[in-house]
Amino acid sequence: KTIQYARNPLAYDQNWLDRGLIVAGNYANTYPIPITPKWTSYWLRDELLNYGFNEVDTVFYPPLQQGAPYIIPAINEGVGIVNYRGWGDANGWHYPEFHVDDVNDLNNGWLTPVFFSYVCNSNDFANNVDPCLAEAIIRGGTPTVPKGGVAFIGPSDLHTSTKYNNVINAYMYDAMLNYNIVELGPAMQAGQSGLVKEFPAQSGPGEAQEFYANVYNILGDPSLQVYLDTPDEFNFNIQPIYSSERFLDFSVTSSNGDPVPQTVISIMNNGDILSKGNTDLDGRYITTLEFEDLTDIDIYANKSGFVQGHANVVIGDNSSILTLSNIDISTLSGNQLPALSETVNMALTIKNESNAGTDAIQTELVFMGNVLPNLFPIEIPSISPNSSVILPPITFTCYGTNVGESVIGKIQDSDGFTLFTFAIEVEKPVFGIDFIDSGLPSSILNPELLITNYSGGSYDDIKILLTPISEGASVSSNGSSNLTNSFVPFESSTHQTSYDVSLDNVAYGSDITFQIDFEKDGIVFFSQEAIMHIETPAINYPVAPNNYGYWAYDNTDVGFAASPEFSWVELDPQFGGENGTHYQLDDDDHVDIQMPFPFQYHGVNYENITVNSNGWASFVPCDIDYFWNMSIPMYMGPKALLAPFSDDLETIDTNGDGNIDRWINVYSWYDEENGRFVIEWSRALNGYDEITEETFEIILYDQNAMPTETGDGVIDFQYLHINDVDVTKNYSTVGIESPNKNYGLQYVFNNVYSPGAAPL
């Protein structure tokens, strides 16, 4: 199943991979009955359709308890993914029902989807129920007439929780849809890592982070990619390869002719890997292979969104008498691959393949750039029949590469005719670079860097160059220009720079970007950007801006023109308010309101706003009444979010007569004179104890009343009485989030405040 899915998934249906099936059930055998499995599934359906799926079928309980009559035809038609949230065990999904025995009734052939089963016990491969649902799905069918799925992700434990499964579900699809992390292993790990962000307090032994890292498992190949649409196919452009030099040079393009960079390449023969690596930005890959007496090789190409590419290449015989039979590389560090800037010693072996002796030849060895020295006169001496000679060794240094991670060398005769072409693979430099200290506005500092060498390369006598590439900083030499540095493989070390950095009067919370260059022998061989963060020191400074440029100022930010003044606008008539429009909201309820003026938010104009009973609003309409507050940003949830106090707010029946006595009262008012629109949550009960009252409001300003440079409206959050008490449910979330949900400005989450934020 895995091989067919990877190599020829479209053989029987060209369109099945852009269809999906989502199954969900809101059920529990004790109160309360969860409602979020269907919410999560509605959200996922919309995200898949927005991503580009042509069709996403849904089978939900309620209303359907017998799910198999609907699930089986959908899978048989062909779907790329099957996603389940709800109630189940090793026997299968119970609401709606789809059990182990139902797998036998599938007839989907080679259209084998990936199953995502975020529900208890469905992947319990050690259960007395044998096979469990996951095993039945994977084992389904025969090698010639398959059925079921190609892979299955789900937990083995019987006691998983809805709130954690929802997060893992959301974070897995965030990784796959938004960050192109589509291999099963990394995608599942991304889902599990979501618990670290959304439930930071659940970090102890046996708590959620550890527990779900253990119980979620993959049946199937963890390196299998999930096709999220109809995949593209590779085209190969392969230059002839000859046995006299074994130099392989080819490129891969998409079906429309575009280069495909970072394609994972494997060169194989008879199951042995001869070479592996990634294509460069032009989709090109080069290597000199080591083999004897081979007649052909296989090239495999893998990249997300593509069917695995395969090409068989016949090794040609160019009737050359001389062959380049060996390339011997040695380095000062003793590593197999030379690092950039490292001295390399190389000796070539030339073999006479004929039965007659050869004459001496005057040649030149030429490197195609990025190598010093790059030209060597070499004499190939006369060679006896069927004998070899080792040429005198040469010494050089690579400061860059020609194609991918390799440099190209050629041996040419006196007429310029190329006798041999070869490639030398270089260790790719991979560094993490961070400033150790935070800068302060209007200060001068000599920065230290924490540098982590993530590669196997050794680097010695390296100078570090520092250049600002954003406004707000300048650098000057401090006289210690002779400082040199060494970087040991797979280790971190601190390094003093030879520069003084002068910071302007930049804002706290700003990021100043510098270019870090590594230089040796006067040649820069590595460059990378690093950010110096200007840390906010105390609560009386604004919270740093988000990606778009929103800052958060509160009334404790002394000396800033944008700092707001608290001036409560009461709309609830029971407490002296007037003119407000009243919305009586139920538990987990919302109302859509037309705003009195267009409001620009993150560069987009909106005319309506969804106001939710749980202390949040969104400019993009949202019919799902999310009550569990998440961090900002979080892929699942309302889009274009305003969260003045996102938390689970409740209605109650005080006397037990079955009728609600305390509603969630929301009011809105257009203050035309002052160009502002006010939305108040009045004395709403916190779901933590159903006693604590929360009163807060949003004020949106018209551009005519409070203009900004970008045209985006100013947003005020005001708090009359607030108690952030919900200790069992991540307290509250306060902040804003972009319409695309890929960034935001988080003021507080789970009682942890951003630098500069004042406690509510």
Where are these regions (language model features)?
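Terminal connector regions
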Residues: A301-V314, F396-F431, D500-T536
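Extracytoplasmic Ser/Thr/Pro-rich, glycosylation-prone low-complexity segments
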Residues: I22, L503-V506, H533-L760
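Short acidic, flexible loop segments centered on an aromatic residue
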Residues: V264-N270, K351-L372, T452-S474
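A recurrent domain-boundary module in secreted/ectodomain proteins
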Residues: A190-S193, S203-Y242, N302-I321, G416-I424, ...
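Intrinsically disordered, low-complexity Pro/Gly/Ser/Thr-rich segments with frequent PxxP/GP/PP motifs
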Residues: R284-Y285, L372-T401, S476-V506
